Amino acid sequence: MDSNTVSSFQDILMRMSKMQLGSSSEDLNGMITQFESLKLYRDSLGEAVMRMGDLHSLQIRNGKWREQLSQKFEEIRWLIEEVRHRLKTTENSFEQITFMQALQLLLEVEQEIRTFSFQLI
């Protein structure tokens, strides 16, 4: 995994955790949790691709990986929509920058997961 992507995830998660969005802080915590889950999933797919010998055991052991992949894409789409909504509603420049970077990172991660999944098929 690219070290820039790791630091981008860490940076965005740290900045999002510092935000105070009033009554929607519960929603923000949910977004942070999903970001962390997405990062772990992307990392595990990347590791599976790097260890192609494990590919077949991964597919045999986990026959539901395509279903999980589909679920992750749904989560990414939900996060993208949520981040876009936050961008439209916030006037705070710190939040705007954070959510713009989060959106860019989500799009990059979506592409990486697609690339990994095509290699696994």
Curated annotation (Swiss-Prot):
One GO CC term on file: host cell nucleus
Pfam families for this protein: Flu_NS2 (PF00601)
Motif (Nuclear export signal): 12-21, 85-94
Coiled-coil stretches: none
Compartments (UniProt record): Virion; Host nucleus
Keyword set, alphabetical order: Host nucleus, Host-virus interaction, Transport, Virion
Major location (coarse): virion
Superkingdom of origin organism: Viruses
One GO-annotated biological process of the protein: exit of virus from host cell nucleus through nuclear pore
Biological role: Mediates the nuclear export of encapsidated genomic RNAs (ribonucleoproteins, RNPs). Acts as an adapter between viral RNPs complexes and the nuclear export machinery of the cell. Possesses no intrinsic RNA-binding activity, but includes a C-terminal M1-binding domain. This domain is believed to allow recognition of RNPs bound to the protein M1.
Additional note from the record: Average number present in a viral particle is estimated to be 130-200 molecules.
Subunit structure: Interacts with protein M1. May interact with host nucleoporin RAB/HRB and exportin XPO1/CRM1.
Similarity comment: Belongs to the influenza viruses NEP family.
Protein name: Nuclear export protein
